[in-house]
Each structure stands twice: as structure tokens, then as C-alpha cells.
């Protein structure tokens, strides 16, 4: 969405956020170049579960957006008469579920180039290119009329591709390099990005 930068240049919001792009002519060269990259960061408080992140004294993660930005009620009928159950038979628990990755089988992949009309063209799987277009154009700093998104077969994304993933990274690399690029996430990157 609009709340996340394409590359986190000021703040890393979560494990797996992209902070740099390494582009090379072969995968071997790319891996060697990536190994040479050195990043200095100031470690911020890390919230390893949702309850810590929404605590009243928690630091704001996304500037201008509350950490608890969406709440829903659990509706399950009339209130239960707890007085009818002895205290010795009552228990109070607090629980939450961790983030569940979508675990689609095919890798997140795509490619991009500048076409004969001078448009940055990105091919990727998506289930909402009409939703992604303004986010990606804004993220890489090009007008929407200079960006073309082509939807490849999406397969079973299970919601993973409802938000843009690699498209902005591909578009940014094409814009900077002015040559064709491709990007294939491995399964670790699929889960953490």
C-alpha cells in the first residue's frame, strides 16, 4: 500500500522488508554482490507479537497510523451467566494467533523492461493490477500513464497477491538501470516479504 516505501531507507518495519536491490547479469554475480553489501542500522524496539505491538506504551510502527488500526467484534450470542458456574470451574485465558503466511506453491516472480513506447512494463502475477497500479506508480515515482502492469497467471495466491509485492522492486530496478530485469523470490523470501 501507500504506507510502505519500496525500499526501506529510513526505517525497517518488519522482518523481510527490502532495504536494497542488487542487480547483476547472473545469479552468481548477484549473490557475490549481495554478500559485499554492508548495512549499518540503529536497532529499534522489536515487537515479536501483536499484543506487545498494541500495548499503550508501544512505539508507533507506521508514522501516522495507530498500531491497532483495525478491530472487530466477536459476536456469539447472549452474555453467558458466569455466576452459575463455581469459581473453581472457571478459567480465564488470553490468546492470539501468529501471522500465518499464505504458503502458495509457485515462487513470486516477475520481469520488467522499458517498451518501445518508453513505458516501464512489469509482468507479474497479481489478483488486482487495477489496485496495484497507483501504489506502484507512486512508489517508484512515475506517472501511471508511464507504467504498464501485465497480469501473468496468478495460480493459487491465497490472498498473497492482493497487495503488490515484487512489482515495485522490479519497476524501480528497470527505471534506474534502463534495461530488462527479472526477480524470483525463493520460498523464504515469499514467506517473509
Positions of predicted regions on the chain:
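Structural alpha/beta core scaffold segments of enzyme domains
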Residues: 1-193
Amino acid at each position: 500500500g501507500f504506507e510502505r516505501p519500496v525500499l526501506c531507507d529510513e526505517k525497517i518495519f518488519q522482518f523481510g522488508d527490502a532495504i536494497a536491490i542488487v542487480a547483476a547479469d547472473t545469479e552468481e554475480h548477484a549473490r557475490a554482490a549481495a554478500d559485499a553489501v554492508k548495512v549499518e542500522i540503529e536497532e529499534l524496539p522489536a515487537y515479536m507479537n501483536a499484543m506487545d505491538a498494541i500495548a499503550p506504551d508501544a512505539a508507533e510502527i507506521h508514522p501516522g497510523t495507530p498500531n491497532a488500526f483495525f478491530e472487530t467484534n466477536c459476536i456469539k450470542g447472549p452474555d453467558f451467566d458466569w455466576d452459575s458456574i463455581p469459581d473453581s470451574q472457571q478459567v480465564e485465558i488470553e490468546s492470539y494467533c501468529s501471522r500465518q503466511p499464505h504458503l502458495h506453491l509457485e515462487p513470486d516472480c516477475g520481469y520488467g523492461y522499458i517498451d518501445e513506447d518508453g513505458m516501464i512494463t512489469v509482468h507479474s502475477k497479481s489478483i488486482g493490477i487495477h489496485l496495484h497500479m497507483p501504489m506502484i506508480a507512486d512508489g517508484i515515482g512515475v506517472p501511471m500513464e508511464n507504467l504498464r502492469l501485465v497480469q501473468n497467471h496468478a495460480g493459487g495466491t491465497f490472498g498473497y497477491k492482493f497487495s503488490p509485492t515484487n512489482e515495485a522492486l522490479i519497476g524501480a530496478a528497470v527505471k534506474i538501470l534502463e534495461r530488462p530485469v527479472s526477480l524470483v523470490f525463493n520460498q523464504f523470501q515469499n514467506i517473509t516479504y
